[in-house]
Every structure is written in C-alpha cells, then in structure tokens.
Amino acid sequence: MSKAVLVLEDGRVFTGRPFGATGQALGEAVFSTGMSGYQETLTDPSYHRQIVVATAPQIGNTGWNGEDSESRGERIWVAGYAVRDPSPRASNWRATGTLEDELIRQRIVGIAGIDTRGVVRHLRSRGSMKAGVFSDGALAEPADLIARVRAQQSMLGADLAGEVSTAEPYVVEPDGPPGVSRFTVAALDLGIKTNTPRNFARRGIRCHVLPASTTFEQIAELNPHGVFLSNGPGDPATADHVVALTREVLGAGIPLFGICFGNQILGRALGLSTYKMVFGHRGINIPVVDHATGRVAVTAQNHGFALQGEAGQSFATPFGPAVVSHTCANDGVVEGVKLVDGRAFSVQYHPEAAAGPHDAEYLFDQFVELMAGEGR
C-alpha cells in the first residue's frame, strides 16, 4: 500500500495512505468539527492555503454533487485534506461522483487513515501551524520534509483576499420577474461564498459582486442601497485598502453589512485591532450571544483571526459610537460589532450557513430593513 505523511511544523509526523491526488501540499493545518458539509468546506475560499483536518471519522459518504459547492466553478480551495476513514462509495441521489475522484480531478493532495482526533488534540494544545502532506514522489527524509514545511509563508501577515477574489465584476439577479429588484447591493468579494448572493436574490436584491481591488468611486457609480463585505482568507491586518474603502463607505452614510473577514474589516475601520487565534473557530455548532437581546444562536464559523474586544464594550469612532454586539459563548471571542445608530453592522460567523444552522439568517432581513429605512 502506498504511503502518505502529514508533517507539522513542530516536527510531529502522522503516517497514513494517499487520498485524492498524490504529491505535495503545503499550508496551515487547521481542523473543522462539522459532522457534515464537507463539500461546502472544501470549496469555501476562506480555506485558501490551509490543510483541513476533518474531526468526523468518516468523510465522503454523500459523494460530490453539482449543487453544494460554495465557489464559482466548484473549485476546491483547500490546500490539502486529512481524513480518518474515507467512504469507499457515494450514497446520495444527487451525487455525480465520489469525493476522491473530485480531489484527483482538481489535483488536491490528501491523506487518509491517520488518527485525525490525535491531530486535532495536538493542534488544540499547540495551535494551528504550518504543515505539509507528502506522498508518492514527494516523499523524502523527515528532516527534509520538515524543512519544506517550515520554509513556507506564515498565515500571519498573509494578504490573500486578492488571490481568491473575482477578477471581473458580475451580477447576481434577484429571484422573481426579470428586471425587478427591491434594492441594489455592492458586494466586495474578499472570498465570497456563493450562498451569500443567493440569500440576497431570494430577498429580491440585485447583487453586484466586485473585485477586492474595487475603489469607492467604482462603488459610487453603482449608486447602491447598501455595501456588503464578504468572508475571505488571510490576515485582516494586511487589508489596508479594504479598510480605507470601508471608511469611505461609512463616511458616505451607505448602509453596510459584513460577514467573517468583513467583520474584521469593519472592526478595523472603526478602530479595533485584530489578532491570530490559537486554533480558531471552524465548525457548524458554535454558540454566539447577541448582547442586545441575550439570545444565543448556534452558528457556522470559519476563522483563525478575530477582533480585540470584550462583550458589550462601547467605543468611540469617527462615525459615531460603536459597540461589541456579539461574543462566542464558549470563549468570549468577539463575534460582532456595530455602530450604535445601526448604519453598519457585522458578524464573525456565517448567517448564510452552507453548511450549518440557519439561526442567524435573519441578519439578511435586518440589512434589508436598514436599506429600506435609509430611503436611498
């Protein structure tokens, strides 16, 4: 049987067998606790340059289909994939093939047959770190593989939004009669998931998806009723252009809504700083407290960076007073910020789910109400 190894930056090596394509994959080792939704995870641009370790013991049961991908063209964005027990066959009426066949087709190097729970315990205690998956002709002496892993770029300081963003603007039309829309939203693609424009479309909103390099002048030409900041990969401390753009949007009084990376961008625009978490939040059952209502929502999350702040913290900004609106019930991490006057708000989690619970989908309706109230 062929051999594959997962090599971590600190020298730990896990031995298994190839899964998917063979060769070499380098990235940051992170773990996802979702028991389902592996296709959505693999195609989420936020996982760019990361090797995802699945905590669920069996992966691939439902195969691969043409409907659940969260990237345009069904592109897999993870750098590599590590699983315990891949299902030998696909069992779902929508499946068009197996997970392994798709990994091979897209040349994603993976590893199977390793103690993924052991890897997760190691990452929980040591933190997410540089890693590599090696098989076939990429195998070498452990010292050489460790050197390759350590030589790669760190996620800290990585500016990745431009690598996953659309190169050209495109429009997602609203559901319903052609040419009829309630509002127009300018969505900045920092790694946007396809289910986000779908959520706008279901609410009768025309969504202009724009490159990460878009200027305020280009947004203003669209005369949007609101601006949306998407999820995405990398270190938000590097996204100075988007932060400056966000401040221009706030200064113009245009309603603004952000998700995940967009939450970190809005936080930075309001004066907060960011930091790299030890191992991040990646799963589909993470509880978040809304400090305005006291209610708890079960949320889908995927982030390794967060905003500095505390529950209910109020702070002054050039755009008026702001507050930390949401925090994680598990560890107190900031999960949302907003301007007190309501013109701009964001959350660290994913109300569009895909995969995950729909507890927070109402936030899209809140954004619609905000745009309606502005009367633009």
Swiss-Prot record:
Classification via SUPFAM superfamilies: Carbamoyl phosphate synthetase, small subunit N-terminal domain (SSF52021), Class I glutamine amidotransferase-like (SSF52317)
Lineage of the organism: Bacteria, Bacillati, Actinomycetota, Actinomycetes, Mycobacteriales
Quaternary structure, from the entry: Composed of two chains; the small (or glutamine) chain promotes the hydrolysis of glutamine to ammonia, which is used by the large (or ammonia) chain to synthesize carbamoyl phosphate. Tetramer of heterodimers (alpha,beta)4.
Catalytic site positions: C260, H350, E352
CPSase as annotated region, ranges: 1-183
Native source species: Mycobacterium bovis (strain ATCC BAA-935 / AF2122/97)
Binding site for L-glutamine: S46, G232, G234, F261, Q264, N302, G304, F305
Gene name of the encoded protein: carA
GO biological process, one term: L-arginine biosynthetic process
Molecular function per GO: ATP binding; carbamoyl-phosphate synthase (glutamine-hydrolyzing) activity; glutaminase activity
The protein's name in its UniProt record: Carbamoyl phosphate synthase small chain
